[in-house]
A protein has these predicted regions:
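A basic, amphipathic helix-loop patch mediating RNA/tRNA/ribosome contacts
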Residues: 8-50
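N-terminal beta-hairpin/loop module of FHA
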Residues: 1-6
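Short, Lys/Arg- and Gly-enriched loop/turn segments at beta-strand edges
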Residues: 63-67
Length: 67
């Protein structure tokens, strides 16, 4: 799926909530902490990692292309 970034960046847990993978920001943080999220192909464990345009986030088989 594609996600159009409105600002300079978005926190990883907020992105997961915004696109509907996580029901809440807290659930998004758990997904990240459990190692279920990759950013540009690498497992990301920082819950509030700043996601910027051009990055690709994947979680539970869903891929998010940030533009």
């Amino acid at each position: 799926m594609k996600f159009e970034l409105k600002g300079e960046h978005i926190a990883l847990c907020d992105l997961l909530k915004t696109v509907g993978i996580a029901q809440t920001g807290g659930q998004g943080k758990v997904f990240v902490a459990d190692g279920n999220v990759t950013v540009d192909g690498a497992i990301e464990l920082r819950k509030t990692a700043k996601i910027r345009k051009g990055q690709v986030v994947a979680c539970f088989g869903e891929t998010i292309e940030v533009s």
